[in-house]
């Protein structure tokens, strides 16, 4: 195995929960303000996951004060403190961009039942 692959595997976080598009997640992000560091929570629906390995990212969407806000997070970033899966969603697409056009009850996602 070459050096780049070994380095990339060392950077992978082992404690990432299993989640997919449609799931509602709570992402705890480390925010640095001057010398202070605090944790900011961003909760919303995962609308996509892309890439693989160290460069894998996921996008979370939520509506805040009537405005849709989307944030893309690198999955293995040291800034992402932890990810909690709040609710499992049942969707039939891998990219949920159609949620951008929907408002209110139309933007709801069915719940996935676990066995």
Swiss-Prot record:
Disulfide bonds: none annotated. InterPro entries: Ribosomal_bL19, Ribosomal_bL19_CS, Ribosomal_bL19_sf, Translation_prot_SH3-like_sf. Transmembrane segments: none annotated. The keyword Ribosomal protein applies. GO terms for cellular component: cytosolic large ribosomal subunit. It comes from the Bacteria. GO terms for biological process: translation. The keyword Cytoplasm does not apply. GO terms for molecular function: structural constituent of ribosome. Signal peptide: none annotated. SUPFAM superfamilies: Translation proteins SH3-like domain. Coiled coil: none annotated. Keywords: Ribonucleoprotein, Ribosomal protein. Pfam families: Ribosomal_L19 (PF01245). HAMAP family: Ribosomal_bL19. This protein is located at the 30S-50S ribosomal subunit interface and may play a role in the structure and function of the aminoacyl-tRNA binding site. Belongs to the bacterial ribosomal protein bL19 family. This is Large ribosomal subunit protein bL19. It comes from Desulforudis audaxviator (strain MP104C).
């Amino acid at each position: 195995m070459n050096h780049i692959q070994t380095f990339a595997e060392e950077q992978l976080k082992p404690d990432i929960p299993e989640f997919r598009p449609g799931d509602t997640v709570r992402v705890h992000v480390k925010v640095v303000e001057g010398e202070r560091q605090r944790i900011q929570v961003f909760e919303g629906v995962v609308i996509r996951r892309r890439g693989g390995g160290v460069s894998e990212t996921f996008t979370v969407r939520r509506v805040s004060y009537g405005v849709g806000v989307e944030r893309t997070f690198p999955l293995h970033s040291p800034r992402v403190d932890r990810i909690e899966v709040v609710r499992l969603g049942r969707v039939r697409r891998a990219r949920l961009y159609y949620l951008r056009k929907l408002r209110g009850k139309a933007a709801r996602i069915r719940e996935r039942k676990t066995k």
